[in-house]
Design a protein with these regions (language model features):
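Bimodal "functional hotspot" detector
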Residues: 1-193
Length: 193
């Protein structure tokens, strides 16, 4: 016969193991709910004020490796930096649409755009989700950068170069491939349809 204290110890250990298993399931459910809630809590930017006008956006087509030129109506503020921010916001919104040819995280957004050197240089500050949740790959990342630079260049007269920073800080790469330490020309030689 098995000693009584050994039976009690085994029963206590099995009960503790069952309790830890239930606690683990509880934590897993909480983490899943937290991730879902985080994805749904993208801050809503106030609507841009200003007259509605047509802007040219160049959206990436990941399947064909090119940029597609489109005209989109948007409310554009008169101040150049706010106007540039709204242009980038509209572009990112196009990428976030359900049937986008270049999908990006729903929580990705532009924080600020700074125009320097008499509007010849743009510094685009994006949020962490833009880079952290961006799909990795040379073509996908370069299409993102080309789309940003060419779209801003098509809508801001005299703009020559664009730099992207993440949460106000320089970052080496977008998602492991596209170099964010330098500037991207608004005249990138990229196939546009």
């Amino acid at each position: 016969m098995i000693p009584r204290n050994l039976v009690i110890s085994i029963v206590i250990m099995l009960a503790a193991l069952a309790g830890l298993g239930l606690y683990g399931l509880h934590l897993r459910r909480q983490a899943a709910e937290l991730l879902k809630a985080e994805a749904d809590t993208k801050p809503v930017a106030p609507p841009a004020s200003g007259p509605t006008g047509q802007i040219t956006i160049l959206t990436p087509d990941d399947d064909h490796g090119d940029l597609v030129r489109r005209q989109v109506a948007a409310a554009l503020p008169p101040e150049p930096a706010l106007r540039a921010r709204e242009i980038v916001h509209v572009l990112i919104s196009q990428w976030q649409e359900k049937n986008s040819t270049h999908p990006i995280a729903p929580s990705a957004d532009v924080k600020e755009v700074f125009l320097l050197d008499n509007n010849k240089t743009a510094i685009v500050d994006v949020n962490g989700a833009f880079a952290d949740q961006h799909r990795s790959g040379v073509l996908v990342e370069e299409l993102t950068m080309a789309s940003l630079a060419r779209t801003l260049g098509a809508n801001i007269a005299g703009l020559q170069q664009v730099k992207v920073i993440v949460d106000g800080r320089e970052r080496e790469t977008l998602a492991g491939h596209a170099d964010l330490t330098g500037f991207y020309s608004t005249n990138l030689d990229w196939h546009v349809e």
